[in-house]
Regions:
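Conserved PLP-enzyme active-site core in the AAT-like
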Residues: 1-187, 192
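Conserved C-terminal alpha-helix-loop-beta "cap" of PLP-dependent enzymes
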Residues: 188-272
């Protein structure tokens, strides 16, 4: 799916092709035709090994329907005789507000740096899934050097004790800020927050697979980059920095930071 976190976009679009691995994006995770078309376009080029999605998407909060992905993969298996592995970047809502594996997705991927770590003091990632799939990942982990150091592992274990409390409080605070921005009388803004998307299909997916809205959202300002940075520089409480899920309130301009490595035409297509 697209958009993805900027680092993931760079991995899929720039690094994996150097290893002979290609990708076929779809932008609307609520549209069966787009998912089917992406699967068939990828299959025409070779074996489809992985369907990788991120929902809600960073930074637009676009959704991908888990049930739709599962049905599309079942139909693909009926046509082609095999089923690609599915994986979801669940960083934005998980592991508290969304559970992809319970909805038919094979692997759930996390930046543990964010909400799970929760204090902006470590860099880590995690993946959950069946014993068979995790066993395959463990077999290659040593070759890629992705073992986490003991101290960071201890800090993650420490942070998980307060994860539910932190995520619920952050989500409640973000909801108040998002609604104030959307309703403020000074300047009308488009606020990309799950509670403020009026599309019935979007809200149906929210009700079905999300138990909360999370605390990361975006706003759309007229005036381009200059207006965005005037807004950022005028804030007093929010710090201009990348990342999310910590105890501080942060704001950033994605096109200049997290998604700066994504080609401009791709950013324009997905609204970043």
């Amino acid at each position: 799916s697209t958009p993805l976190y900027g680092g993931t976009e760079t991995l899929i679009r720039k690094i994996l092709p150097e290893w002979g691995i290609g990708g076929e994006p779809f932008a609307d995770g609520l549209a069966p035709a787009q998912i089917e078309a992406a699967l068939e376009a990828a299959a025409a080029r070779g074996k489809v090994s992985l369907v990788y999605i991120e929902t809600p998407a960073n930074p637009t909060n676009a959704l991908v329907d888990f049930e739709l992905v599962a049905r599309s993969l079942a139909a693909f298996e009926a046509r082609h005789g095999y089923r690609p592995v599915s994986a979801c970047d669940n960083t934005m809502l998980g592991p508290i507000f969304q559970h992809p594996i319970g909805e038919g997705i094979d692997l759930s991927v996390y930046s543990l740096t964010k909400y799970v770590g929760g204090h902006s003091d470590l860099v880590a990632g995690g993946v959950t899934g069946s014993a068979a799939l995790i066993g395959r990942l463990k077999a290659t982990r040593g070759a890629f050097g992705s073992q986490l150091d003991p101290h960071s592992s201890w800090m993650i274990a420490r942070s998980m004790e307060t994860l539910v409390l932190r995520m619920r409080r952050a989500a409640a605070s973000a909801s108040r800020v998002a609604h104030w921005l959307a309703d403020n009388p000074i300047r009308k803004l488009q606020v990309l927050h799950p509670q403020l998307n009026a599309d019935p299909a979007y809200q149906a997916v929210v009700r079905r697979q999300c138990s909360g809205a999370g605390s990361t959202f975006s706003i759309v300002l007229g005036g381009g980059r200059a207006a965005a940075f005037r807004f950022i520089n005028a804030l007093a409480l929010f710090k201009s920095a990348v990342s999310l899920g910590g105890t501080e309130s942060l704001v950033c301009h994605p096109a200049s930071t997290t998604h700066s490595g994504v080609p401009a035409d791709v950013r324009a297509h997905v609204g970043v």
